[in-house]
């Protein structure tokens, strides 16, 4: 299990709350919406470790009991009349109708948002059915929308896998960008004797890293800024996103961190080469050598297509060791490949993921699996809804 102190080292904990937003960012409010059991568990996890002051976590579910125990500052019971707070029973149509019934409440909660990140586990009732509706509402209020989703374990059966695929296709029509997290591949990074609880926790951790990685880019001021307009421009290439987070310590740590973020045995054939836009955000000590930083930027330019638009951002902090570098890379505009698999991925700074404080390690790109390798919504527990 990941302890809070470890997560803070990964910049998800209290330290991130104390950061002061870039004044130019003011008004670009971020709302993170967890949908169903899986998404709500991610919100719980996010709240436990702390979020930036400009990020509002919202938990939504048709299961009233599960929602009641969530620490989110904003909670919305979907379909109070139609479901009675008893869940969607694994039926997406019920989840969809529940979200439509609660549309006004959802709209009110996100009306001031400039960026809405919606997270869920596909394959069940609430997540699969309600998420596309919530994303559409976010688009209606004028927000940039990013969907971060998981898919069912292969062993959960064809019906659940089919529901997940249908839900994903619907999300493709409405989201500005989609990040699909392959939980079967996450399990490959776990110790062989890892408990069920550790594995489920791991899925939540990866979801939190994805949310934190995106929000960090525009909530932290730096010498070289990537602002909300840059993120909006990058995500304007509607489709699937590739995301990596890497860390390294020592000589050439900036370049090593980048390599950790874009290279992994789990990446298969996915790379940043096919992207149309790339955002790279470095975090390091103020006295980190400029030459090393420059070489890392050159390395990324060499890896990307010559016509790709690459934007670099930089945040410095005295709290980061002088030879340590953390990098977040978001590549957008990728299409799903011929076997139906997407290029979405999320990198973690260690192996296995449950040890996020390891200073130098292989970044683990977790790519959406092939049609035969579908993965888990954070569910199985009570997350079927």
Curated annotation (Swiss-Prot):
Biological process per Gene Ontology, one example term: protein polymerization
Quaternary structure and partners: Homodimer. Polymerizes to form a dynamic ring structure in a strictly GTP-dependent manner. Interacts directly with several other division proteins.
Gene Ontology cellular component list: cell division site; cytoplasm
Species in which this protein is naturally found: Helicobacter pylori (strain J99 / ATCC 700824) (Campylobacter pylori J99)
UniProt keyword Plastid present: no
Superkingdom in the source lineage: Bacteria
NCBIfam families (UniProt xref): ftsZ (TIGR00065)
Signal peptide, first to last residue: none
Protein's gene: ftsZ
Molecular function terms, GO-annotated: GTP binding; GTPase activity
Record's subcellular location: Cytoplasm
Sites where the protein binds GTP: 37-41, 125-127, 156, 160, 204
Protein name, entry field: Cell division protein FtsZ
InterPro entries reported in the protein's UniProt record: Cell_div_FtsZ, Cell_div_FtsZ_CS, FtsZ/CetZ, FtsZ_C, Tub_FtsZ_C, Tubulin/FtsZ-like_C, Tubulin/FtsZ_2-layer-sand-dom, Tubulin/FtsZ_GTPase_sf
